[in-house]
């Protein structure tokens, strides 16, 4: 919480705040990882936008000069396990099928994976759709996979929103989790497709950013 300018932790000179963000990049874990991700998605809405651009440029310079830093940042895509488990479970639905946490299984890996690849290629865009378009334009991401990721992300977000609203109506704690057995046949197929794209994207990131050799 308190990610706002009235919090001293989120304001400072270009040099001072730049040093703070540099520290987040050098130790991307826990709160540092979360803060760095928030910063990389930030965009100016008032004041001197160039100040934000200067700090972000310095971070990108540091990151792209050290592959290990980008890899450590990207490792968070595996924080909640693999999409393969959810995907395989959907292939053989039974009476004991677990709920699917859409954020952990697909939304976060797509958003953070694209964020990480954008950092590696110094893509200045801050939205996932814009980053995918820029990465495809640069040849850093195949257009078909980029399209699948974007479509999958939109589908997962819609499904999670609908599930959350249904929980609200029933007076339950909102989780946004989905019971695959309550989905239509088409929705299950689309969910399988989305998680399949996530699985392939994570494999690509592991290979491209050498995540398996990061200590």
Predicted regions and their residues:
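A nucleotide- and high-energy phosphate-metabolite-utilizing enzyme signature
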Residues: 1-215
């Amino acid at each position: 919480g308190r990610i706002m300018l009235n919090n001293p932790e989120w304001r400072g000179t270009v040099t001072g705040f730049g040093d703070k963000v540099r520290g987040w990049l050098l130790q991307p874990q826990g709160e540092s990882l979360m803060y760095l991700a928030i910063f990389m998605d930030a965009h100016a809405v008032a004041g001197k936008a160039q100040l934000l651009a200067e700090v972000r440029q310095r971070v990108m310079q540091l990151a792209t000069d050290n592959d290990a830093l980008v890899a450590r940042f990207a490792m968070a895509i595996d924080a909640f396990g693999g999409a393969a488990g959810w995907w395989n479970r959907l292939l053989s639905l039974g009476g004991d099928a677990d709920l699917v946490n859409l954020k952990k299984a697909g939304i976060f890996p797509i958003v953070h994976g694209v964020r990480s690849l954008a950092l590696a290629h110094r893509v200045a865009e801050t939205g996932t759709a814009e980053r995918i378009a820029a990465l495809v334009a640069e040849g850093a991401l195949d257009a078909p996979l980029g399209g699948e990721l974007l479509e999958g992300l939109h589908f997962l977000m819609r499904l999670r929103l609908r599930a959350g609203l249904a929980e609200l109506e029933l007076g339950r704690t909102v989780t946004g989790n989905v019971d695959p057995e309550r989905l239509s046949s088409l929705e299950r197929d689309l969910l399988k497709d989305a998680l399949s794209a996530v699985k392939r994207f994570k494999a690509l990131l592991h290979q491209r950013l050498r995540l398996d050799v990061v200590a």
